[in-house]
């Protein structure tokens, strides 16, 4: 439901194979709720048995993220609901290495329990398809004009949307959620053209990149957003823009 419903969302995390000497880091981050920034929950330290429980106030269902070391695991956090997440830490560590990043045999390292376990599980197969700016994007957009940047972002959006729509492993609820997040990230990327283009050389570590002329005709630049269905839908409640 998209109705406002203030209540506690509880996340219980179990790290299988955990040992304190591993220095494992664990953060749980909300993607909206009261703030336009990704906000970490306060939580207790990981217990010696690898368990950790977090509770936070929420007013809407939202996608939150468990970050274990550098691996991000999205899930649906819902008011007045508890999600139990079991993570196989040795397998996750193996899957995070470049040697096994594409090895399907080491991909299964997380299991969910709760009302939305099916959506949470399916989200893992599309989590790399919901942001138009990927790991090479800032390198790609160095030196682009605003219009070139817009075309780059639009092509990325269309490619990722097609991948979500053709994914037979996800149900309609997960597909709608992934489409909504991708669409709003697309809109966010268009609005953030000045900052992204300006910061690209520094982030990509490139010197001598000419400064782009940031002047645009705003009406034509943002014209593609008129076709974005999520802007006319209640699903935009799941994002902070």
PLM region spans:
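A non-transmembrane, solvent-exposed segment enriched in polar/low-complexity residues
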Residues: 1-172
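Extended amphipathic alpha-helical segments with heptad-repeat/coiled-coil character used for oligomerization
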Residues: 175-241
């Amino acid at each position: 439901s998209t109705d406002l419903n203030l209540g506690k969302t509880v996340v219980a995390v179990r790290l299988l194979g955990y040992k304190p000497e591993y220095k494992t880091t664990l953060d749980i981050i909300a993607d909206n709720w009261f703030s336009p920034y990704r906000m970490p929950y306060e939580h207790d330290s990981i217990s010696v048995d690898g368990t950790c429980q977090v509770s936070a106030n929420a007013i809407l269902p939202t996608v939150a993220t468990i970050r274990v070391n550098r691996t991000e695991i999205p899930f649906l956090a819902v008011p007045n609901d508890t999600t139990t997440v079991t993570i196989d830490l040795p397998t996750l560590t193996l899957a995070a290495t470049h040697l096994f990043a594409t090895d399907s045999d080491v991909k299964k390292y997380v299991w969910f329990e709760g009302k939305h376990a099916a959506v949470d599980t399916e989200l893992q197969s599309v989590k790399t398809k919901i942001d138009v700016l990927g790991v090479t994007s800032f390198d790609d957009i160095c030196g682009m004009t605003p219009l070139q940047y817009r075309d780059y972002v639009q092509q990325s959006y269309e490619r990722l949307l097609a991948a979500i729509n053709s994914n037979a492993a996800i149900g309609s609820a997960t597909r709608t959620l992934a489409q909504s997040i991708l669409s709003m990230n697309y809109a966010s990327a268009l609005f953030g053209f000045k900052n992204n283009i300006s910061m690209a050389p520094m982030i990509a570590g490139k010197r001598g990149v000419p400064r782009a002329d940031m002047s645009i005709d705003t009406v034509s630049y943002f014209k593609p957003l008129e076709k974005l269905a999520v802007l006319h839908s209640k699903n935009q409640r799941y994002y902070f823009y």
